[in-house]
Amino acid sequence: MDWKAWMDAFLPALLEAFPRRVAFVGIQGSYGRGEAGPDSDVDLVVVLDELGEAELTACRALLAQMPFADRTCGFFCDRAALAAWPAFDALQLKLDTLPVYGSLEGLLPPMGQEALEQAVRAGASALYHAACHTALFDACPEEALPALQKAAFFALRLAHYRRTGRYVAARRELLPLLEPGERALLEDGCTLPALMAWAKQEMAR
């Protein structure tokens, strides 16, 4: 699917549904990274001036009329909610979103180095817990590894950004920049204890 052609149909319809009320529209996820496959979701970011029951109903109806409606998902919010969003989480939104209409500047909460530190620790701690939970409670832990490695990829992006000051969104571009031990977390042969060990190390930095 050509996400730009999809967006060329969606954006005018959204602007018509909410005249002078759309603050920002962007794309994130695999399409934003340039890594989409034939079954990838259309991962939207939409910021309105207000988002309540009426707006949710209108957005749902609009999305239902779009091609590939069953593959749309994303982050919808209003200005006030985004301004109050935890900075470490908003940082990830900023880094991972490709703008299509408007700008996130002026909409996001203040964020600095501490937000990045918190984002890395949050991603690492979530990975640690998920790997530990899988090892203890999943009937077939090895089947959960691909999903855990995807979570590790997101955490590794932030850790690399903290280490180098350069944010690299795409997996194919990030892999050669990682340390060998980090790269192994995304390759065949990765283990749950290895994911936990790396996550614990990043939380302690």
Locations of the language-model features?
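Short acidic/polar active-site loop segments enriched in Thr and Asp
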Residues: 23
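Catalytic core of pol beta-like nucleotidyltransferases
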Residues: 1-16, 20, 32-38, 49-205
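N-terminal loops that bind phosphate or other acidic moieties
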Residues: 43
